[in-house]
Amino acid sequence: MAHGPNYKVKYRRRREGKTNYYRRYTYVLNRSDRVVVRLTNKYVIVQFVKFDPKGDITVAAAHSRELMKFGWKGDENNSTACYLTGYLAGLRAKKAGMTSASADLGLFTPTKGARIFYVLKGVIDSGVKVPMGDVGVNNDRLAGKHIAEYAKKLEQEDPDKYRGLFSRYLARGLDPKDLPAHFKEVLNSIKSGEK
């Protein structure tokens, strides 16, 4: 592993691929609050964090599993769920007194149209200011119209594949073709439930 006497071992969290210390250092120097977005294989996690010398303080947070409390029956990590989770976290942050934050994407490499930007769009729409340029957030994808169109097409072409691919939606009692309407219902439920 070592390459001679001048080899410098990186910090443990950097070796594990968890922390970019240079980026974290810039956040600390800015003294700005951060909206930390992490995507796992199944879920979306959003936290609003303030810096403190003793350790970061989490002011508000939301997890995509919490969407089920508001009636969400879809997947917990698609673009629609990302938006709703960001919106929920933004409302909680506003209630806690945060008005603006910087996006902390961790080790994620920004790609146009990525799910992580749907989270930030949800945060912005909730009323928290986050600097974000044109990153390819599509309003049709935000509401799940692309999923509904694909489900409609697949049901006609290959019903077995349709039932297999959308089995979780169907088991939860949601027809994937009705996802845009379901999205609006859940969004209204979040707006009324988090006041």
Curated annotation (Swiss-Prot):
Gene3D superfamilies: 3.30.420.100. One of its GO terms (cellular component) is cytosolic large ribosomal subunit. GO terms for molecular function: 5S rRNA binding; structural constituent of ribosome. The keyword S-adenosyl-L-methionine does not apply. GO terms for biological process: ribosomal large subunit assembly; translation. Keywords: Ribonucleoprotein, Ribosomal protein, RNA-binding, rRNA-binding. Pfam families: Ribosomal_L5e. It comes from the Archaea. InterPro entries: Rbsml_uL18_euk. Part of the 50S ribosomal subunit. Contacts the 5S and 23S rRNAs. Belongs to the universal ribosomal protein uL18 family. This is one of the proteins that bind and probably mediate the attachment of the 5S RNA into the large ribosomal subunit, where it forms part of the central protuberance. This is Large ribosomal subunit protein uL18.
